[in-house]
Structure formats: structure tokens, C-alpha cells
UniProtKB/Swiss-Prot annotation:
Keywords assigned: ATP-binding, Coiled coil, DNA damage, DNA repair, Hydrolase, Metal-binding, Nucleotide-binding, Zinc
UniProt keyword annotation of Electron transport present: no
UniProt comment concerning the protein's domains: The two conserved Cys that bind zinc constitute the zinc-hook, which separates the large intramolecular coiled coil regions. The 2 Cys residues coordinate one molecule of zinc with the help of the 2 Cys residues of the zinc-hook of another Rad50 molecule, thereby forming a V-shaped homodimer.
Cofactor binding, note field: Binds 1 zinc ion per homodimer.
Positions with a binding annotation for Zn(2+): 437, 440
Function: Part of the Rad50/Mre11 complex, which is involved in the early steps of DNA double-strand break (DSB) repair. The complex may facilitate opening of the processed DNA ends to aid in the recruitment of HerA and NurA. Rad50 controls the balance between DNA end bridging and DNA resection via ATP-dependent structural rearrangements of the Rad50/Mre11 complex.
Species this protein is from: Archaeoglobus fulgidus (strain ATCC 49558 / DSM 4304 / JCM 9628 / NBRC 100126 / VC-16)
Taxonomic classification: Archaea, Methanobacteriati, Methanobacteriota, Archaeoglobi, Archaeoglobales
PANTHER family linked: ABC TRANSPORTER ABCH.3 (PTHR32114:SF2)
Name under which the protein is recorded: DNA double-strand break repair Rad50 ATPase
Residues binding ATP: 13, 33-39, 128, 792-797
Length: 886
């Protein structure tokens, strides 16, 4: 026995995060259309069996803007609790008494321990619109009954056996065709033996020829190896000879260059010896020039410094004298200005208090004037602003009132449109219906069709009129709302001006206790006196600074006069130094330096002759050593060249280039011939291997002939006749099972329907009839001992019969017990009276089932429910809450 306990749904269909708890008895899932009720039943189906029986794609189930769904279903099976958790990414697990992982493994476990998927969807879970489809639709009824009674399994077995028999017949014919080729295969075997013998003889002949040719090639290779060694040795000696001769030429060139350099060095030594002698003669005059030139340079620099300092001091003294005169004049003006400052300070003190007060009030006065200017700019007064604020408050109230009316009106229109759509759909179905009324389920005739269509047309007209009135009211409300919203657009501006008026009143009240005109006049007088006083103080500061420097300037002037005396003393000291060197004047010293300069320059030109002479002497010694070394190397290289020439002549007596070329050509020709023989041998061996393989295959085929003859005999005498007999038994047993299954379903349905209709109908019959050459399974009810077609039943009775059949199929599959029943919208197109009657009929019977789950938006079913689960849509998301059962 199975009982569902709890279902947790995340991001599945319209459910974001829902938790549903189920109890025993009747669980009603209620709510408006589109709220997400049926999604709960789909979640149960997917949790048990995965996506396949739901005939849905994963992407259709995942909630918008989420990455994937997850489901968790807790249930009790034979007293043990289990939980199945499935995710859209394939992560699935069953926990409880057993632990099972993986989508397919869990589905297999459910089908083994609970029931197969087709049983669940055919009997336990009746989807929306299918409760009476088994009664109204002949094809649907026969398909469901064939699935649940497993008649299709026997038909499939009968068809599959036919396919097996045909396959054996084809295999038998194939084997016979093969046996007919026995003589041809024997002939092919003898031909292959002859081919193998011929190829073997040719291989022996070619192998003998190849061995002889291989020996000749080996001898040629040995002689060619000797010649290659001689050739290689000869080429090596010639390279050595070329290298040595090149070395000889290089040494001869080097020797000539060294002798040339030695000659040039000897000539430079002779010239430098003459210059060294001249340097010794010029040295005393050069030294005298250096001493006097240094003295002259120092005295000239000192005289320039003295003259510069003398000029700077003279200019500085003139400047100080001018400043001293100005300071003495400023000192006489200072007393007069100080007296004037004292007078203005007393006058400033009289106006200071008024000025300070005005400075405090000035920002507020400016703000008040600014507010007045802004209001005048907009042609506003405080009274006008107050009136605007009152109008704004009224507009807010009116907006709230209109918005509330629009909400109620839109809700009413939505309800009218929904009812109109239902009526339109019902009218369309009435137009196309043939025998049964889709509204009440009764037999349909033209008068009944016209009456219902007229009633529905009148109601649709009334709904259209109400919708038109509602549209007109909505239009007027929206026009009023638009005007109010335009008025409210100025809300921020009105509030801003009202705040400015409040501020203006506060400022006027605060400033009314002060004489602003008097304060302004006294403040202006204060500003003027302050301006004159600041000017005099600036002058006083400048004069005071100037007068305070008189003493300092006189002291600086005395210091400059002393410095000028020192400068004159330094000039006399410089002239004394000139006389000490034996010159009467600076000009005489300059003439002496000028006369010695040519001797000094000549000495500078020749002074490094001695060091250069020493360097050239060392260079001469080095060149003489290098020449001796080059002569020795040249003699050695000439000897080596003679030795190599002798070895080359000796090698040419035993090596012939002509013989080498001739033997190489012969070796190439015979190598190609040998390669051709090897290639031919490989081809022959491959042909031999292929022929031997073909021979083996032919021998194997001949060996199979007896086995295939036995197989053909088994097929003809045993397998095919026996399978044909078994297939015929399946055909007979299929008909027997079909008859027994239908009688059992018929018995269960009769019991349930009789109880649902409180004995009005005493039975249900299933009969096969033929219409237009096609066999159909039709349903009849027994009323007062007579069989009647289902057109005799009312709409509620049709639903009851459909429910009886669904329950009968469930009992057939699970041995007479119904632990669980799930119904999705069992009352489509029934009016209030018929729905109430169906509730009355079915409630007592459904209470015999341990657990029933019904999805419906009909209020009448709440009376029959033990638990009411209410589903509503909020912002496109399904929300679940529980309502107390009535």
C-alpha cells in the first residue's frame, strides 16, 4: 500500500519554492486557472518516473530565469518511508529502506515495487480532460484497455514469432543456396593446389639466381670499398698539399711586410735622435716662460678683481646715500600721520556696533529679498501659493479614489472575459459536436443544441454589454486620472514654493524689530572711515620701516669707505710683486713673456721625442725577432709540402679513377637486377600466401557442408513447424486473455458504477461491434434490466461512468485494491448543479480509497475534501497555503 506524504518543488513550472503535505482521505488542490495546480501532479509523476511518461521536455519544466529544477517526494510503501529526489541535471537518489542512485535505476525500482509507468498514467493518475475520454472516445478507450490488460503484449509476441519464422525461412534458403555450390568449390580447390605448386617452383628458380647475383655484388662492393678508401686518401692529401702551399705563400707575404716595417722604423729612429738633441737646448727658455706666464696671469686676474670690487663698492655707496636721504624725509612725515590715525580710530569706534549688527542680519535680508524676487518672477504671492497647496492635497485624494475604482473595474472585466471565453469555447464545441452534448453529456439533438446555444448567446451578449459599459467607465476614469496626474506633476514645485513662503514669513517676523535704514547708513559710514584708517596705517607702516633704517644706513656707508681703502692697498701690493721679479711695469713683464712664447711652443712640439725614440727602438728589436721566426716557419712548410707530394705520387700508382667509375656502374646495374629479383620473390610469396589462404577457406567451406545440411533438416522438420504451432497458440491465448480481462474489468466497473449511482444502474457491458467494416469496443449500461448506450446518461453520470472505468482498471491491475487515486480537473464544462450532483455521487465511494488527490478550481469539491491545499499565482510565482476543510 502506498501513501504520499510530502512533495517539495523548486523552480518547476511556475513554482519557485513550494512544499505540499498530503494526508489520508481526500486532498483537494484548489485555485484559479493558471495558478499552478496541475504542475503539482506533474511533479509527482516526474518524481516517480522521470520525464518519459510525462511526455515533456526538461526545458519546458524549468522555471523562467532559473538554471534547473529539483523535486523531492516522500511516500510510505507497505509501512516503510522512502524519499525520491530528482534534479534536472540528472542527479537523483532514492533513500529509505534501500538506497538507489541514478534516474533510470530509480524508475526501474518504482516500476518493480509500485507499478509500471503505463499503469500509473492509465489508472492511478487521471489527467485533465481524460476522466470521461475513456467513455466518449472509442479509440482512446480501446487503446487504454489494451495497454492495461496487456493484450498488446500477446499481440506483439504473436507478431514477433511471425518475424522469427520468416527469418528462419530466409536462413534455410540461404543455406540451401550455399549447399548447391559444393561441386564448384571442389573444382576451385584443385585449381588452387595447381596454382600453389607452380608459384613454389618459380620461387625456387629465382632464389638460386638471386644467390649467384648476390655473390657478384658482394665482390664488387669489396673492390669498390678499397677504391673508395684510396680515393678518400688521395683527396685528403691533395687538401693537405693545398693547405701547406697556401701557408707558404702566407709566410712569404708576411716576411716581405716585416722587412718593410723594419726599414720604416730605422728611418724614424734617425729622425727622433735629432729632435731629442734640440729639446735639451730649448728646455731652459721654456721653463722661464712657464714661470713668467703664470705670474702675469695671476697679476692680471688680481687686478681685474680689485677693479670690480672698487666699482661695486662705489655703486653701493651711492645707493645707500640715496636711501639715507629718503629715510630722513620719511621720519619727518611719520609724526603727522600718527596724529591723524588716532583721530580716525575714535571716529570708527562710534559706528562699529551698528556695523557688526548689520553684518549679522545681512544674509537673512539677502535671503528674504531673494525669495521675494523668485516669487515675483513667477507672478506668485504667499496667498496664491497657499491656494495651490490646497488644490494639490485634493488632487492626491482624488487620485487614490480613482485608482481604487480602476482596480475593482479591471477585476470585474477580467472575470467577464474569462466567462465569455468559456462560453465561446462551449459554443464552438456545440457547433462541431455530433451525438453527445459536450456541456451536459446527454444525447445531442438539434433542439437541445439550439436551446443551449441561445442561452449561451444571450449570456455572451449580456457580458459584451457589461464589458462595453465597463470600457466606457474605465475610459472616463482614466481621463480623470490623467488630469489629476498632470496636476500632481507640479507637486514638487508647489511644495518648494510653499516652503519658500514659510521661510519668507519667518524672516520678515525676525527683521521687523530692527531699523534697517539707520543700520545701513551707519554701516556705510563705518566702512568709509575704516577704509581711510587702513590707508593711513599702511603709510605709517611704510614710513616707520624707512625711518628705522637711518642708523643702519650710516653704518653701512662707513664700512664701504673702509673697504675702498683696502682695495687701493691691494693694487699697490700687486705692483710691488712685478718689481721684485726685475720688471719696472706690467707692460715690461708682458713683453718678456711674448718674446719667450715661440721657444716654449717649439719645446712643446718636440718634448716627447725621447719617449718616442725609446718606443721605436723596442719596435725595431721586436720586428727583427719576428723576421727570424717567419724564416724558420717558411723552411718547415716547404719541407712538409715536398713530403705530401711524394705520398700523392705513390698513391696514383695504385689508384685508377677510370677503373673506379667502371666498377661503380657495374655494381649499380647488378644491384638493380638483384632488387628486381627480390621484388619478384616478394610478389610470388604474397601470391603463394593468398593462394594458400584461399585453399584453406575452400577446405573450410567444404567442411561446413555436412553441418549446413543438418541445419536445413532441423529448420524444415523441427524449428519452423514448432514455432508455427506456438504462434497459433499465442493467437488463441490472446483472444482468451482479452475476453477474460474485459469480463473482469466489466465486473469491477459494474460494481463501482452501481454504487456511484446508488443502484440506478445495475451493470456495465463491454461489447465488440462492427461499424463501417471496422471492429470497435463499445460501452453499454444496464438500466432496469435492459442494455442502453451511453447517450442515455446525463453529464454527471457520464463522469461517474468514466470514474468507474478508471477505478475498475486500477483494481484489475492491482488485484482489486486501490490505495491511491489522482484526478486532475474531473468536472470540465459541468454547471453548478451537475458538479454538486457529481460530488454527491462520488464522495462516498472515494472515501473508501485510502488516499485521493483531486485538482480542481470548483468550490463545490471543498465540501467533500478532508484537506484543502490552495494554490495562487503572485507575480507569476505559484504560492501554496492550506485552507480549513468545510
Amino acid at each position: 500500500m502506498i501513501l504520499l506524504k510530502e512533495l517539495q518543488i523548486k523552480n518547476f513550472r511556475s513554482h519557485s519554492d513550494s512544499k505540499i503535505e498530503f494526508d489520508t482521505g481526500i486532498n483537494l488542490i484548489a485555485g484559479r486557472n493558471g495558478a499552478g495546480k496541475s504542475s503539482i501532479l506533474e511533479a509527482i509523476l516526474v518524481a516517480f518516473y522521470g520525464l518519459k511518461p510525462a511526455t515533456l521536455r526538461k526545458n519546458d519544466l524549468v522555471r523562467v530565469n532559473s538554471s534547473g529544477y529539483s523535486l523531492s517526494l516522500t511516500f510510505s510503501l507497505n509501512g516503510d518511508d522512502y524519499t525520491i529526489s530528482r534534479k534536472s541535471n540528472g542527479e537523483s537518489i532514492l533513500t529509505g529502506k534501500e538506497i538507489v542512485e541514478g534516474d533510470s535505476n530509480i524508475t526501474e525500482w518504482v516500476e518493480r515495487h509500485l507499478c509500471p509507468a503505463h499503469v500509473f498514467t492509465g489508472a492511478i493518475y487521471v489527467r485533465q480532460g481524460e476522466i470521461d475520454s475513456i467513455i466518449r472516445d472509442d479509440e482512446s478507450r480501446e487503446r487504454i484497455i489494451r495497454q492495461i490488460t496487456r493484450i498488446e503484449d500477446y499481440e506483439n509476441a504473436w507478431k514477433n514469432l511471425g518475424a522469427v519464422i520468416r527469418m528462419l525461412e530466409r536462413e534455410k534458403e540461404r543455406l540451401k543456396e550455399f549447399l548447391s555450390q559444393e561441386e564448384q568449390i571442389k573444382r576451385q580447390k584443385e585449381e588452387k593446389k595447381a596454382e600453389i605448386e607452380r608459384i613454389s617452383e618459380e620461387i625456387k628458380s629465382i632464389e638460386s639466381l638471386r644467390e649467384k647475383l648476390s655473390e657478384e655484388v658482394r665482390n664488387l662492393e669489396s673492390r669498390l670499398k678499397e677504391l673508395e678508401e684510396h680515393k678518400s686518401r688521395l683527396e685528403s692529401l691533395r687538401k693537405q698539399e693545398s693547405s701547406v702551399l697556401q701557408e707558404v705563400r702566407g709566410l712569404e707575404e708576411k716576411l716581405r711586410e716585416l722587412e718593410k716595417q723594419l726599414k720604416e722604423v730605422v728611418e724614424r729612429i734617425e729622425d727622433l735622435e735629432k729632435k731629442a738633441k734640440e729639446v735639451k737646448e730649448l728646455k731652459p727658455k721654456a721653463e722661464r716662460y712657464s714661470i713668467l706666464e703664470k705670474l702675469l696671469s695671476e697679476i692680471n686676474q688680481a687686478l681685474r678683481d680689485v677693479e670690480k670690487r672698487e666699482g661695486d663698492l662705489t655703486r653701493e655707496a651711492a645707493g645707500i646715500q640715496a636711501q639715507l636721504k629718503k629715510a630722513e624725509e620719511d621720519n619727518s612725515k611719520l609724526e603727522e600721520i600718527t596724529k591723524r590715525i588716532e583721530e580716525l580710530e575714535r571716529e570708527l569706534e562710534r559706528f562699529e556696533k551698528s556695523h557688526r549688527l548689520l553684518e549679522t542680519l545681512k544674509p537673512k535680508m539677502d535671503r528674504m529679498q531673494g525669495i521675494k524676487a523668485k516669487l515675483e518672477e513667477k507672478n506668485l504671492t504667499p496667498d496664491k501659493v497657499e491656494k495651490m497647496y490646497d488644490l494639490l492635497s485634493k488632487a492626491k485624494e482624488e487620485e487614490k479614489e480613482i485608482t481604487e475604482k480602476l482596480k475593482k473595474l479591471i477585476a470585474k472585466k477580467s472575470s467577464l472575459k474569462t466567462r465569455g471565453a468559456q462560453l465561446k469555447k462551449a459554443v464552438e464545441e456545440l457547433k462541431s459536436a455530433e451525438r453527445t452534448c459536450p456541456v451536459c453529456g446527454r444525447e445531442l439533438d438539434e433542439e437541445h443544441r439550439k436551446n443551449i446555444m441561445a442561452e449561451y448567446t444571450r449570456e455572451m451578449k449580456r457580458i459584451a454589454e457589461e464589458l462595453a459599459k465597463a470600457d466606457e467607465i474605465e475610459k472616463k476614469l482614466k481621463e480623470r486620472l490623467e488630469k489629476v496626474e498632470k496636476a500632481l506633476e507640479k507637486q514638487e514645485t508647489v511644495l518648494k514654493y510653499r516652503q519658500m513662503v514659510d521661510e519668507l514669513k519667518a524672516l520678515e517676523n525676525e527683521l521687523s524689530s530692527h531699523d534697517a535704514e539707520k543700520l545701513s547708513a551707519e554701516s556705510e559710514e563705518y566702512r568709509k572711515v575704516k577704509e581711510r584708517l587702513d590707508g593711513l596705517r599702511g603709510q605709517q607702516k611704510i614710513l616707520l620701516s624707512s625711518a628705522s633704517r637711518i642708523k643702519e644706513l650710516k653704518s653701512s656707508l662707513r664700512e664701504i669707505e673702509e673697504a675702498l681703502k683696502n682695495v687701493e692697498s691691494e693694487r699697490g701690493e700687486l705692483h710691488r710683486k712685478i718689481r721684485e721679479e726685475g720688471f719696472e711695469s706690467l707692460e715690461e713683464l708682458e713683453r718678456e713673456v711674448q718674446s719667450l712664447r715661440p721657444f716654449y711652443n717649439k719645446w712643446l712640439e718636440l718634448k716627447d721625442a725621447e719617449s718616442r725614440l725609446e718606443s721605436e727602438l723596442k719596435r725595431r728589436e721586436k720586428l727583427e725577432d719576428e723576421i727570424s721566426e717567419a724564416i724558420a716557419k717558411l723552411e718547415e712548410a716547404n719541407g712538409k709540402a715536398e713530403e705530401i707530394r711524394g705520398q700523392i705520387d705513390e698513391l696514383l700508382r695504385i689508384y685508377s679513377e677510370e677503373e673506379h667509375r667502371r666498377l661503380s656502374d657495374e655494381h649499380l646495374r647488378k644491384s638493380k637486377e638483384l632488387a628486381g629479383l627480390k621484388s619478384r620473390l616478394e610478389t610470388l610469396r604474397e601470391s603463394l600466401q593468398s593462394a594458400e589462404k584461399d585453399l584453406k577457406f575452400l577446405e573450410e567451406q567444404l567442411a561446413k557442408m555436412d553441418e549446413y545440411r543438418k541445419k536445413v533438416e532441423v529448420f524444415e522438420k523441427i524449428a519452423i513447424p514448432e514455432l508455427t504451432r506456438i504462434r497459433e497458440k499465442f493467437r488463441k491465448y490472446r483472444n482468451l486473455v482479452a475476453e477474460n480481462s474485459m469480463r473482469e474489468v466489466e465486473r469491477y466497473a459494474s460494481q463501482i458504477f452501481e454504487e456511484l449511482t446508488e443502484g440506478k444502474y445495475s451493470g456495465v457491458r463491454l461489447k465488440k461491434t462492427t461499424e463501417r467494416g471496422k471492429e470497435k469496443l463499445k460501452v453499454f449500461v444496464v438500466y432496469q434490466g435492459e442494455e442502453r448506450e451511453i447517450g442515455f446518461l446525463s453529464g454527471g453520470e457520464i463522469i461517474a461512468l468514466g470514474l468507474a472505468f478508471r477505478l475498475a482498471l486500477s483494481m484489475f491491475m492491482i488485484r482489486g485494491k486501490i490505495p491511491l487515486l489522482i484526478l486532475d480537473e474531473p468536472t470540465p464544462f459541468l454547471d453548478e448543479e451537475r458538479r454538486r450532483k457529481l460530488v454527491d455521487i462520488t464522495t462516498n465511494y472515494l472515501r473508501k480509497i485510502p488516499q485521493v488527490i483531486i485538482v480542481s478550481h470548483d468550490e463545490e469539491l471543498k465540501d467533500a475534501a478532508d484537506k484543502v491545499i490552495f494554490v495562487e499565482s503572485q507575480g507569476g510565482v505559484s504560492r501554496v497555503r492550506y485552507v480549513e476543510a468545510q
